[in-house]
UniProtKB/Swiss-Prot annotation:
<dbReference type="GO" id="GO:0005886">
    <property type="term" value="C:plasma membrane"/>
</dbReference>
<feature type="domain" description="PPIase cyclophilin-type">
    <location>
        <begin position="7"/>
        <end position="170"/>
    </location>
</feature>
<dbReference type="InterPro" id="IPR002130">
    <property type="entry name" value="Cyclophilin-type_PPIase_dom"/>
</dbReference>
<dbReference type="GO" id="GO:0016018">
    <property type="term" value="F:cyclosporin A binding"/>
</dbReference>
<keyword id="KW-0413">Isomerase</keyword>
<dbReference type="GO" id="GO:0003755">
    <property type="term" value="F:peptidyl-prolyl cis-trans isomerase activity"/>
</dbReference>
<dbReference type="GO" id="GO:0061083">
    <property type="term" value="P:regulation of protein refolding"/>
</dbReference>
<dbReference type="InterPro" id="IPR020892">
    <property type="entry name" value="Cyclophilin-type_PPIase_CS"/>
</dbReference>
<dbReference type="GO" id="GO:0005737">
    <property type="term" value="C:cytoplasm"/>
</dbReference>
<protein>
    <recommendedName>
        <fullName>Peptidyl-prolyl cis-trans isomerase</fullName>
        <ecNumber>5.2.1.8</ecNumber>
    </recommendedName>
</protein>
<comment type="similarity">
    <text>Belongs to the cyclophilin-type PPIase family.</text>
</comment>
<keyword id="KW-0020">Allergen</keyword>
<dbReference type="InterPro" id="IPR029000">
    <property type="entry name" value="Cyclophilin-like_dom_sf"/>
</dbReference>
<keyword id="KW-0143">Chaperone</keyword>
<comment type="function">
    <text>PPIases accelerate the folding of proteins. It catalyzes the cis-trans isomerization of proline imidic peptide bonds in oligopeptides.</text>
</comment>
<dbReference type="GO" id="GO:0006457">
    <property type="term" value="P:protein folding"/>
</dbReference>
<dbReference type="Pfam" id="PF00160">
    <property type="entry name" value="Pro_isomerase"/>
</dbReference>
Length: 172
């Protein structure tokens, strides 16, 4: 079975920025890929937090040029929240895939086995994250959109303009 493909339709500063299409590595990280896929479709309804388990209308709250663009905190919006489809946090599935360069999709965490809904898209090779963050996908279309998001970031991670997932879902 081919790996699922999901999308984010992004806006930057209230203006449409385009679509990011990602392939999820369900073949190597099925649990992590399924969490992200279901958070793209919103099919699991409301989570324990009382918020929808859905990336729609969430923001990229931390963007560091030359490093990564981070999002997925749909409960607090600032990097302190988020929730997985499995309940609060879930274990690191494996570290088979590596942070090999731009477009790698990986789980943000607060230490071992603390995966929720926060993720990041690499904009460079970040090999120091290997063995610490679970790589579960890659951007297959829309790296230009990722680059546009990267442009509004800063060394502190604060964005100059609001970066929002206006819509998201599954393509295949």
């Amino acid at each position: 079975m081919p790996n699922p493909r999901v999308f984010f339709d992004m806006s930057v500063g209230g203006q449409p920025a385009g679509r990011i299409v990602m392939e999820l590595f369900a073949d190597t990280t099925p649990r992590t890929a399924e969490n992200f896929r279901a958070l793209c479709t919103g099919e699991k309804g409301t989570g324990r937090s009382g918020k929808p388990l859905h990336y729609k209308d969430s923001s990229f709250h931390r963007v560091i040029p030359g490093f990564m663009c981070q999002g997925g905190d749909f409960t607090a919006g600032n990097g302190t929240g988020g929730e997985s489809i499995y309940g609060a946090k879930f274990a690191d599935e494996n570290f088979i895939k590596k942070h090999t360069g731009p477009g790698i999709l990986s789980m943000a965490n607060a230490g071992p086995n603390t995966n929720g809904s926060q993720f990041f898209i690499c904009t460079a090779k970040t090999e120091w994250l290997d063995g610490k963050h679970v790589v579960f996908g890659q951007v297959v279309e829309g790296m230009d959109v990722v680059k546009a998001i990267e442009k509004v970031g800063s060394s502190s991670g604060r964005t100059a303009k609001k970066v929002v997932v206006e819509d998201c879902g599954q393509l295949s």
